[in-house]
Regions:
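Conserved acetyl-CoA-binding loop-helix of GNAT-fold acetyltransferases
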Residues: 82-85, 91-107, 245-258
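Conserved GNAT acetyl-CoA-binding A-motif
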Residues: 78, 99, 106-122, 261-272
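Active-site rim helix/loop that mediates acceptor-substrate recognition in acyltransferases
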Residues: 20-74, 179-214
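Extreme N-terminal starter segment of soluble prokaryotic enzymes
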Residues: 1-3
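Active-site/acyl-donor-binding loops of N-acyltransferases
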Residues: 67, 120, 126-153, 227-321
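Conserved beta-strand in the GNAT
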Residues: 51-57, 61-71, 77-84, 216-230, ...
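Amide-forming acyltransferase catalytic core, primarily the GNAT-like/NAT-type
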Residues: 134-237
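A short, well-structured alpha-helix characteristic of acyl/acetyltransferase catalytic modules
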Residues: 9-23, 163-188, 310-317
Length: 321
């Protein structure tokens, strides 16, 4: 069977939304889902880049599988999301073939720069491993807000903290791909963080929750950026920077207080390379547990030799798409 990778035009994107509603339209009507997708696709990612939809077709023009690509780091790191195969085409390897074709296309496009493709799987690892992806540690800390007493959230450090109302207020925010010997970091761009907040505002409107004007909390050198997940009733930390456990506690205390005020029962923060591990039970004292993220397993496909021996560390929720 001869298969071809095809970039969808705007009309095809809308038609595909009607199909993928089955997979990602939970808690939404079809009309709401269609509005969500068109609004998120209209978001500006900078660099003249945008979200693109890719279709794997056979000779008859049937769409066998589809996905979207996101410009995480301009011409270096691409994110893959919304991989979808209709039930009648499942079990035939079409999603794997779609990603193989896409990886080949991006490899040819990368222009000799360190580059990679990332995704976050909600269907396990095997299907993506066959396309050349490998999984990395995917845990998160879940803080149960109703078990955190007000006393635990009091800040006794004297740190001057301010809420973030504009992401451009974050001084020294790192963006892009950073390589350090055998490790590398991928930082979500401010455009991607704004995409998360656009998503929050869409759900806030659908669920009559309004739109929050607070995007996180900062000190003179540290910050937490968060979003309110109305779909899963959680405050999610998108990006963070702190230099010790004292700063970490102060920032998280503010996140918990804000979640309580918004009626969110949980605060969730991704954990990679034991950045947060063990501190919650010792330094912090918050009611928390570390769990594997079965609905967003981080996976990466390296496109360039520069990163083959590297270890992807410090994964932030802000990279999710």
């Amino acid at each position: 069977m001869k298969l071809k990778l095809h970039k969808a035009d705007p009309k095809e994107q809308i038609q595909r939304d009607e199909v993928t509603f089955e997979g990602w339209g939970q808690k939404l009507s079809l009309q709401q889902y269609m509005k969500r997708e068109s609004t998120l696709r209209s978001h500006s990612w900078g660099y003249g880049k945008s979200v693109e939809t890719w279709l794997l077709k056979n000779e008859q023009g049937d769409i066998l599988s589809s996905c979207e690509t996101y410009p995480i780091v301009a011409d270096q790191v691409w994110g893959v999301g919304s991989v979808f195969t209709e039930p009648k085409w499942r079990g035939m390897g079409f999603a794997t073939q779609l990603l193989r074709e896409l990886n080949a296309l991006l490899t040819a496009f990368r222009q000799s720069r360190p580059s990679a493709v990332i995704l976050f799987s909600e269907v396990g690892e095997r299907i993506y491993e066959r396309a050349g992806f490998r999984a990395v540690e995917s845990n998160e800390w879940v803080i149960d807000v109703d078990q955190c007493s007000p006393e635990l959230c009091l800040d006794h450090t004297g740190m001057k903290l301010e809420y973030i109302s504009d992401l451009s207020e974050i001084s020294g925010y790192s963006q892009g791909l950073v390589i350090d010997q055998d490790r590398f970091w991928i930082h979500p761009s401010l455009a991607q963080l704004r995409w998360h907040h656009l998503r929050e505002s869409i759900y806030g409107d659908f669920f009559n929750q309004g739109v929050s004007s607070v995007y996180g909390v900062k000190s003179s050198r540290s910050y937490l950026v968060w979003t309110l997940d109305y779909k899963l009733d959680s405050l999610r930390i998108l990006a963070s920077r702190f230099f010790d456990g004292v700063e970490q506690r102060s920032l998280l205390s503010q996140a918990i207080t804000f979640a309580q005020a918004k009626g969110m029962p949980q605060v969730r923060i991704w954990d990679s390379e034991q950045v947060f591990r063990d501190r919650f039970r010792t330094d912090l004292g918050f009611a928390s547990r570390c769990v594997r993220r079965e609905d967003s397993i981080a996976m990466i496909h390296i496109l360039s030799p520069d990163l083959l021996k590297g270890h992807w560390v410090n994964l932030q929720r802000g990279l999710w798409m």
